[in-house]
Amino acid sequence: APFQLENELYGLQAKQAAQAAIVEKVIAGQVTATLAGQGIFNPLGKGKVSFPPLMFKLQELPSVLVISPLDRIESMREIVLKQSLTLENKESIEAGADRLGVSSLVVGLGGMATYPSLIDSGAGLQATIETAAHEWLHQYLAFTPIGFRYLLDLTGLSQNYDIATMNESLAGMVGKEIGALVYQKYYSGYEDGVSQVQQTGFDFNAEMREIRKTVDVYLAK
């Protein structure tokens, strides 16, 4: 019986991975097309070629411990923690950090601007679309002065809180705007059909079925 259950688990994981790959391809194509429709192609300003190519992977993401000073709103340091922390674990970590005379908060990551980008597999459809655009813009900006200075801030080589705030704000605005356009164009009738599911949480298979309707169009290109 344990061997049979293990095989079933592997089968389900393989099926989910295959479905996730389709979701990633479809959403990446939709976001890229929408960016192009807004005249956003590449940071080099040469030709209508999208760069860097928009690619992301859906997976469970870790939490982050954000440490700030007590007297002002500013992130002093961010420490990546392991995945699947319980609420008790998070509160214990925060309490330990606070005893050092700082303000701390453990938050979940929605996405990471690695390449390909990593996006939380537990997020809803619209959040996934917005995050895909958000993280891509970070990659786009890395080839511009503001983005390069942000990379220096992230690596600790030249810390600049204002640059970090500007970069995140810009990526956030573009992510929401492009995400809204994509959602309106491709999924305008989606919300009514899944309102009940949204009340209880993210339903991967239900959202997968909706996205799957557009797969053939992209595979034919």
Where are these regions (language model features)?
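Acidic/His-rich structured neighborhood in mature extracellular/periplasmic domains
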Residues: 2-197, 201
